[in-house]
Structures are given as C-alpha cells and as structure tokens.
C-alpha cells in the first residue's frame, strides 16, 4: 500500500501544480504547444496573414504574459510581429486602400512591443503610425460611422467597433496632440452612439449585426 501511495505522489503533485496555474496561462501553453509558430494559429498552417483573429489572440497572450511574467510568451508574439512587419513598418500584404477595419485590430500588439522594445526596434511605432493613417481616410456614412470595408460600402457592422475603436482610442491617448484629443475621443464615442442607434431593432429590443445606409443589402 505504501508503494502504491508513493507512486501516486508525483501525479498528485503535478495535478496540484497544474490546478494552481490560471486557466489563461494553461490555455496559452496549450496553444503554443500545438502551434509552436504563431502563423499556425487560426488554422493558417504557416501562412502569414494580417488578420484580426491571430492579432486578437496574441494581444490576449501579451496581456497574460505581463500579468504572470512569461517572457517566452512575449517572444512568441514578437516573432510573429517581426515576421509580419518589415523594419520600415510595412505590413505583409496590408493595403490601406482596402479600408478594412478588421485590419486595424492586429496592430494593437505593436503598442505593447513598442513599450518593451521601442528603443531597439522602430518598426513597432512605424506600424501603428501607418495603421492610424487608415482611420484618417476611412470611408464613412453620412452620419459619420466607419464603413466596415471598402467592398461593403455604406455598411456599419457591430464587430467593427471592436476592430477599430480600441486601437483608435489607444493611439489618441498615446500620440494625439493635446488640443485634438477631445474631438478625437468625441469621434470614438460617436461611432458607438450612432452605430447603436442605427442597428437597434425596437421590435426585439436587440441590435442587428449590421446596418446598410444604402438599404441595398437585404440582410442588414
């Protein structure tokens, strides 16, 4: 019986240590084990793609790494970021002319990387500056809301708020001239309030996923 309990002891210790790890850390370790290279996240199979799914997941990785001191996770994110952007700050296959708000979201990790490595590598600041330029010329509805994409003219999507506005707000906080901040923050708030007004369905009390100002798309 004593030998039996001695055999179980290492297993019990391992289970105990695992239980002490936050689920966020355990999830990250699982993702990194299954995808040693972040280009394999979201089923990309090693294909580089500037997309919100990978960018959003890696932003969560960075947040957890900062909370729980995991330098290997930071390096994992940085490897992907450096693969996606040249030293000049040019992003792989990114085209501003597509005016896709989904392509604003992944740039958020470059704020964090600039804070950590900006003295060594200027690309992180250059990426955020370039993505910010898209916001300046992003097509809008008559009421001032961002189109979701150039290929979806006049359409405002609820998920577009999250794709663009956290980046827009963070960039404003960090870099906008003080005299411009109030108007920029007001623009951010307007995206939410106007979007909510135009997507709200009084019949159900819910918000539709999207609104088409031109009324040409049947589903929104």
Could you say what each language-model-derived stretch is?
Residues 89-92, 96, 100-168:
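Extracytoplasmic mature domains of secreted/periplasmic and thylakoid-lumen proteins
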Residues 1-20:
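Bacterial Sec-dependent N-terminal signal peptides
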Residues 21-40, 75-93, 126-145, 185-208:
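Long, well-ordered core segments of solenoidal/helical folds
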Residues 51, 55-58, 67, 71-78, ...:
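Generic alpha-helical scaffold signal
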Residues 20, 28-55, 85-104, 148-161, ...:
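Solvent-exposed loop and edge beta-strand segments that line ligand/cofactor-binding
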Residues 55-71, 105-120, 165-180:
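Well-ordered alpha-helical scaffold segments within catalytic/enzyme domains
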Residues 20, 53, 73, 120, ...:
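Residue-level preference for long, well-ordered alpha-helices that form the structural scaffold
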Residues 158-220:
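Extended ligand-binding clefts on enzyme/binding-domain cores
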């Amino acid at each position: 019986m004593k030998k039996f309990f001695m055999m179980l002891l290492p297993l019990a210790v391992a289970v105990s240590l695992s239980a002490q790890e936050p689920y966020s850390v355990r999830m990250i370790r699982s993702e990194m084990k299954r995808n040693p290279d972040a280009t394999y996240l979201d089923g990309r199979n090693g294909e580089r793609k500037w997309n919100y799914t990978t960018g959003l997941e890696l932003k969560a990785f960075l947040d957890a790494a900062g909370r729980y001191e995991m330098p290997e996770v930071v390096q994992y994110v940085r490897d992907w970021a450096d693969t996606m952007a040249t030293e000049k700050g040019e992003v792989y296959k990114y085209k501003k002319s597509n005016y896709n708000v989904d392509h604003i979201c992944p740039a958020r990790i470059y704020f964090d990387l600039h804070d950590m490595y900006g003295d060594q590598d200027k690309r992180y600041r250059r990426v955020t500056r370039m993505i910010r330029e898209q916001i300046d010329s992003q097509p809008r509805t008559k009421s001032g809301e961002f189109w979701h994409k150039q290929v979806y003219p006049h359409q405002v999507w609820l998920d577009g708020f999250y794709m663009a506005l956290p980046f827009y707000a963070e960039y404003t906080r960090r870099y906008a001239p003080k005299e411009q901040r109030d108007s920029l923050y007001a623009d951010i708030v307007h995206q939410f309030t106007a979007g909510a007004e135009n997507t709200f369905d009084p019949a159900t009390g819910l918000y539709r996923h999207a609104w088409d100002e031109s009324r040409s798309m049947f589903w929104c």
